A protein has these predicted regions:
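Boundary/entry segment of secreted carbohydrate-active catalytic domains
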Residues: 1-14
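A short, Lys/Arg-enriched amphipathic alpha-helix followed by its capping loop at the start of a domain
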Residues: 4, 21-27
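Flexible loop residues that form catalytic
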Residues: 9, 35, 70, 107, ...
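Active-site acidic/histidine proton-transfer and metal-coordination neighborhood
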Residues: 14-20, 54-58, 73-166, 173
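Structural motif
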Residues: 25, 33, 96-97, 135, ...
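Short, well-structured secondary-structure segments
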Residues: 28-35, 61-66, 100-104
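Acidic/histidine-rich catalytic cores of soluble enzymes
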Residues: 30, 65, 123-228
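Glycine-rich, proline-tolerant flexible connector loops at the mouths of alpha/beta enzymes
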Residues: 31-56, 105-113
Length: 228
């Protein structure tokens, strides 16, 4: 049976109280952002023990950690060493919390494999996947920016330890494709899912949409009538 979890941070009451709220609403698991209070780069032993104790007291399993990378994900060679190091720390933290899945947004995978960005992203994911697999874990790439067949083929090239975090709302809102068919295409690559809903209101170019945010392109978004 699938484990149903909440996103602890989204209760808006802080991490510890968010874990407690997850139990109160009947869930048995939580996904947590590896940031702020749970940023592995600054997390102290006492705080880690407090989180572990709260999880145990509230009968919550950490189903996944979310390692957010900010603008461009893993698209830029110059930025990747720092981002890869961070995600490896998140993988280690996940293992400490009994969690084998780290979800992340890697940017927009080009359809054209000859695009230089493709190899940059593939090599970064392959390194992270190998690190995760060696520890029995997964890096789960969130769906959305590119068609699911493109992402699936990309993940196959990355090797062990790289899977899909299947977000049906992202797929529908950005690519406008059938999310059910997307599950069939991604298949066993799926290691984590998000329960979200959404509609595609207007056609969008995924690279312009995602890179618009990364470049501070809010005015572009407004001019396209996406923000109303």
């Amino acid at each position: 049976m699938f484990k149903i979890a909440t996103l602890a941070d989204w209760f808006g009451v802080g991490l510890i109280e968010g874990i407690r709220e997850s139990e109160r609403c009947g869930a048995t698991g939580v996904q947590i952002y590896a940031a702020d209070q749970l940023d592995p780069r600054t997390l102290g032993k006492d705080e880690l023990q407090r989180v572990k104790r709260t999880l145990s007291d509230c009968h919550q399993t950490v189903t996944a950690l979310c390692g957010e990378l900010g603008g461009y994900g893993l698209e830029k060679t110059a930025d990747n060493p720092e981002k890869i190091a961070y995600l490896k720390q998140v993988i280690d933290l996940g293992l400490e919390l009994g969690c084998r899945v780290v979800t992340t947004h890697i940017g927009v995978v080009p359809r054209d494999k000859s695009n230089p960005r493709y190899a940059v992203m593939r090599d970064a994911c392959a390194e992270l996947g190998a690190y995760a697999a060696a520890n029995g874990g997964w890096i789960a790439v969130e769906t959305g920016p590119e068609p699911i067949d493109v992402l699936s083929a990309f993940i196959d090239e990355c090797g062990a330890g790289v899977g899909v975090n299947y977000d049906p709302a992202n797929i529908v809102m950005v690519t406008g494709v059938d999310h059910v068919e997307g599950v069939r295409i991604a298949g066993k690559r799926i290691v984590h899912t998000h329960a979200k809903d959404g509609k595609n209101l207007i056609p969008v170019n995924a690279e312009q949409f995602y890179h618009g945010f990364a470049e501070g392109g809010l005015e572009w978004m407004q001019s396209q009538g996406v923000l109303i």
